[in-house]
Amino acid sequence: MSGVNEIRSTFLDYFRKEGHEVVASSPLVPRNDPTLMFTNAGMVQFKNVFTGLEKRSYSRATTAQKSVRAGGKHNDLDNVGYTARHLTFFEMLGNFSFGDYFKERAIELAWNLITKEFGLKKDKLLVTVYHTDDEAAGFWKKIAGFSDDRIIRIATSDNFWAMGDTGPCGPCSEIFIDRGEHVWGGPPGSPEEDGDRFLEFWNLVFMQYEQVTKEERIDLPRPSIDTGMGLERMASILQGVESVFETDLFRHLIDAASSALGRAPDAETVASYRVIADHLRSSSFLVADGVLPSNEGRGYVLRRIMRRAMRHAQLLGANEPLMWKLVPALVREMGQAYPELLRGEQLVTETLKLEETRFRKTLVRGLGLLSEATETLHAGDMLDGETAFKLYDTYGFPLDLTQDALRQRNISVDLAGFTNAMEQQKAEARKHWTGSGEAATETVWFSVREQTGATEFLGYETEQAEGLIQALVKDGKTVDSAGKGDAVAVVVNQTPFYGESGGQMGDTGIISGEGFSIEISDTQKKADGLFVHLGKVASGTVKTGAAVELKVDHARRTRLRANHSATHLIHEALREVLGTHVAQKGSLVAPERLRFDISHNKPISAEELEEVERMANEIVVQNSPVTTRLMSVDDAIAEGAMALFGEKYGDEVRVVSMGTGLHGAKANRPYSVELCGGTHVRATGDIGLVRVVSDSAVAAGVRRIEALTGEAARKHLDEQDRRLKAAAATLKISPADVPARVEALLEERKKLEKDLTEARKKLALGGGAAAGAPSENETVAGVGFLGKAVSGVSPKDLKPLADAGKSSLGSGVVVFVGADEDNKASVVVAVTDDLVGRFSAVDLVRVASAALGGQGGGGRPDMAQAGGPDASKANDAIAAVKAALEAA
C-alpha cells in the first residue's frame, strides 16, 4: 500500500471505521471565506461549523481536500519545480471533531494510523508541541511512549493556530519523520530546521480557546480538532523517495509529458517537467471548479500558472500546445477520486489548448525581445524595471515569466523600477479618464479601481457568497462608514451580483453583515471590471473592511435569466424567418419583459411573428442544456457564434450555446451560438414559454420586438383568454365563433357607414340647411351658389360632396362647412370649370377660413380646402364667400 490513490483511500476508510463522516472535497473557490483566494486547507469548508454558525448532522468528519497555494499570502508558485516539496496544487487529508473527541483521542487516532496502517517506524518519528501544552506532551508519552527528547516544545506561532485576530484558536502538535543522516537538516527548533531531513507530514490543531480581544482569551465550551496531512508528502515517505515529484502519480504525469515531447527528463530538464506536472494539476482542477483564465483575480493567478507551465514546455522543445494533451493522463490518475475532473475534462482540454495557442505568439515574441534587452547583461546583473514593464505592458509578457526566464542566467529584475513605471502609466490613464467627458462623480470609480482592483464575479455559479467591503461611496466621495437611511454605493472583493451590461439589468438583493444590512436596488459595472452595488442602508452602520454576506434576489434573477436566454432564441428565429440580414442593434433584458431592436426595413407580419414564436418555443420544449465555453473571438466566430453590434470584446470571449436545430442547415447542430457575458438558464426548459407581444418601428430600418417569458407569458395568455371569453359572452356565442362573428360585424358596419355617407350626401345636396343658411340653390353675383353647413361628414368626404354639388349646379360656386367632435371646422370651396377664370377657389376658401378663425388654405383654382378653430361660425363663413363673390 503505497500508491497515492491507495493512501488516500486508506486514510478515509480508517476514519470512516472510526465513526467519521466522509465529506467530499469542497471547491477550490471558497464560498464562505472571502479572505481566501483559493481553498488551501481542509478546515475551510468547516469554518462556520467550528465557529458555531452552522450545524451539521455529524460531529466527526474526514476529507481529502483539493488545495491550491498560488497567489496572495499563500503562494508557492515561484518555488515549484526547484524544491523537493513545494506544490501549487496538493491534497490535504484531514480528520475533524466538532465538540466530540479532543486531544487524547486525536493523538491516539493519528498514532494508530501512521504506525499500524501506514507502518511507519516509531524510532523514525518525533513530534512538536506548543511550549506550554503539557497536556499534549503527556498524551504523546502515554500513547506513543515517546521520551522527552522526541517531544520538542516550540514557543513560536508555528505551534499555535488561530483563525484570525479573534475566534477559535489553540496549540498544535506536528508529526515529523527523520529521513536519515544522508539528508541535510536539523530537527524543528534548531538552526538547521529548514533542511529536508526532518519532514513534517501531519499537523494536529487543538482548538480549545476563543480569542475574545487581543488581550483576552477564554476556554471554548466544546473544544474541537482540525488536522491536516499532506497526501503527496506521505506518499513520498511511504514510497521511500526524496521528492514528491518522484511519487507514482507525478511519475505518470511526467512520463506522459516525456512521451508527448519524445525526450526523457535529465538533470537539466527535470525542473521543467516538474513544473508542467504540478501546474497541469492546479490548472485543470481550477478550470473544473469554474475558474477561467483572465487578467484579474483568480483568473489571473490561473493564467500565471498556465503560462509558467507553457514557458517550461517551450524550454523542453515543444513546438505546439502540449498541456491539453496531458489531460487524459491526469484524469486517469485522479478522475475516480474527483468526479468533477471527469465531468469537466472537455472544458479543461479546450481551455488549456486555447490559452497555450494564444500565448505561444506572446511567448516567442517576448523571449526574443527579452534576449535583445539582456544581451549585454551577465550573471549577477539586473534588468531595469522600465524594460521589464515595457515587455509586460506593450507586448503582454508577464513579469513572473521575465523573472523565471532570467533566473537560469542568475539575472534579477529591478522590481522597484517596474512598480514605478506601472504607477506612471496609471497616472497617465487617470489623467485621460478625467478628460474624457465623464461626469465628475464617475472619476471616483477610477480611484477605487486603482486601490481595490477588479471585482471577482461569482454570479455564473452562485447567487449567494461572502465578501469583504473594500470601498463605500456616498454623494460621489469615498467614505469610511454609512448609517441607516444613507444612499450608498458598495464595492466588495467578490460578488454574485451581475452588473448591468450587454442589455441585461443589474441584480438587486441584500448585503448584510454583523449589525447592518443594505438593500441593493441596482448593480453596475464601472472602471474596468469594478462591480458597484447601489443601495440604501436599511439598518445599522456599515463600515469599510466589514465581512458581508451577499444574496441576490433569486426570483428576479430567475426571470432575468429566462428573458436573456429567450432573446438568443428569438434572435436566431428571426434570422431564420426574416433572413440573415437581421442583426441585433440593442436590447433590454428586464425581469418583467425583454425587448431588442433588429435591423429590418419593413413591418413584420403576424404570420412571421407567429413562426418566430413557434420556433423559439420548439427549442424551449427540448429542455436542452445551455452550455458556455471560453474561446478566442476569432475561433468563436469561425464556429458560427454571433457577435453583437456595438459590443466590445476582449481577446477571450464567453460563448453561450443552446438548443439543437431541427430544420434545414441547422438540423442536428447548435441552434443558437452567441458571444455573451450575461446570466442564462441551465436548460432551455427553464424559460417556460416565449410569447412575442409586439413589433414596432423605432428608426429607419430598425424594428423593436418585445416579448414575455415564463409566468409573465402565461399571465398574458390568461388575460387574452379572459378577454376572448368576455367578448364571446357579450356576443352570445362560443369563443371559437368570435373571429367569424367579428368579421361579419365589421362587414355590416362597413356597409352601414357607406349607406350613412350616401344619406348625408343626399341630405346635404337636397336640403336641411342650418338655420340662416339658404335651403335652395341661389344666384349670387349672377352665378349659381350652393352653401351649407353639414354635420357628421369627415373632412376627407367634403371634397366628394363638393364635386357632387358642382354637378348639381352645372355652373356656379359650392361651399360646404363641416365640424368635428372638438367643434373644429373644415371648409371646402369648389368652382365649376367655366368660372375659374373669374373666381379662384383658393382665394375664396381663405376668406371662409378667416371667418372660422383660421388662416390660409390651399388647393387648385377649381377646388380648395381649409380649416378653422370655430365651427359655430359656419354660416359666417358661407356669408363671407358670398360677399367675396359680390365684390369680385
UniProtKB/Swiss-Prot annotation:
| The record's free-text note on cofactor binding | Binds 1 zinc ion per subunit.
Q: Does the keyword Cell cycle apply?
A: no
Q: What does it catalyze?
A: tRNA(Ala) + L-alanine + ATP = L-alanyl-tRNA(Ala) + AMP + diphosphate
Classification via InterPro entries: aa-tRNA-synth_II/BPL/LPL, Ala-tRNA-lgiase_IIc, Ala-tRNA-ligase_IIc_anticod-bd, Ala-tRNA-synth_IIc_core, Ala-tRNA-synth_IIc_N, Ala-tRNA_ligase, Ala_tRNA_ligase_euk/bac, DHHA1_dom
Entry keywords, A to Z:
Aminoacyl-tRNA synthetase, ATP-binding, Cytoplasm, Ligase, Metal-binding, Nucleotide-binding, Protein biosynthesis, RNA-binding, tRNA-binding, Zinc
**Compartment(s):** Cytoplasm
Q: Which amino acid positions bind Zn(2+), per UniProt? A: 564, 568, 676, 680
Q: Which domain of life is it from?
A: Bacteria
Give its E.C. classification number: 6.1.1.7
Q: Which cofactor does it need?
A: Zn(2+)
| Membrane spanning stretches | none
Q: Which Pfam families match?
A: DHHA1 (PF02272), tRNA-synt_2c (PF01411), tRNA_SAD (PF07973)
Does tRNA-binding count among this protein's keywords?
A: yes
Identify the SUPFAM superfamilies for this entry: Class II aaRS and biotin synthetases, Putative anticodon-binding domain of alanyl-tRNA synthetase (AlaRS), ThrRS/AlaRS common domain, Translation proteins
Example of a GO cellular component annotation carried by this entry: cytosol
Its function, per the record, reads:
Catalyzes the attachment of alanine to tRNA(Ala) in a two-step reaction: alanine is first activated by ATP to form Ala-AMP and then transferred to the acceptor end of tRNA(Ala). Also edits incorrectly charged Ser-tRNA(Ala) and Gly-tRNA(Ala) via its editing domain.
The text of the family note is:
Belongs to the class-II aminoacyl-tRNA synthetase family.
Q: What is this protein called?
A: Alanine--tRNA ligase
- Supply the source organism for this entry: Mesorhizobium japonicum (strain LMG 29417 / CECT 9101 / MAFF 303099)
Provide the organism lineage as a comma list: Bacteria, Pseudomonadati, Pseudomonadota, Alphaproteobacteria, Hyphomicrobiales
